[in-house]
């Protein structure tokens, strides 16, 4: 049994996403949902690069990027871009549970590399990414 998959926190996050995204796409009867954990690590002289790198679309309908923890990092700025390639918005997820909700068909999104603030301490950015795609 996978404790994370059965956790109250994850079930709450998925319920929130389901209610929100189903409200935006009332014709959808069933979703394909994926959950991914990402850690971007950085060390002095070697910035932590996001995955995937650069502005992109995930090929799904909706995306939640939920910050779990930032430790000793600078940057990690979330960017939202229009389909024409122009930057529409940028912001930094700072506190645990800060989030970006993305309509993947309408915008590109990405995040900048992270760098350690203090060279000899661990430096990382942990996010939970949840994607919803029409079944």
Predicted regions: what is each one?
Residues 1-34:
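Signature of the catalytic double-stranded beta-helix
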Residues 17-26, 65-68, 97-98, 114-117:
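Intrinsically disordered, low-complexity boundary segments flanking structured domains
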Residues 25-95:
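Catalytic core of non-heme Fe(II) oxygenases with the double-stranded beta-helix
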Residues 76-135:
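Catalytic core of Fe(II)/2-oxoglutarate
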């Amino acid at each position: 049994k996978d404790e994370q998959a059965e956790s109250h926190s994850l079930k709450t996050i998925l319920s929130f996403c389901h209610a929100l995204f189903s409200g935006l796409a009332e014709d959808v009867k069933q979703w394909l949902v994926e959950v991914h954990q990402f850690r971007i690590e950085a060390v002095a002289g070697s910035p932590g690069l996001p995955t995937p790198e650069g502005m992109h679309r995930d090929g799904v309908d909706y995306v939640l990027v939920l910050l779990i923890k930032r430790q000793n990092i600078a940057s990690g700025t979330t960017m939202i871009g229009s389909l024409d390639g122009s930057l529409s918005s940028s912001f930094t997820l700072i506190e645990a549970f800060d989030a970006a909700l993305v309509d993947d068909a309408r915008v590109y999104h990405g995040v900048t590399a992270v760098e350690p603030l203090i060279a000899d301490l661990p430096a990382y950015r942990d996010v939970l990414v949840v994607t919803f795609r029409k079944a």
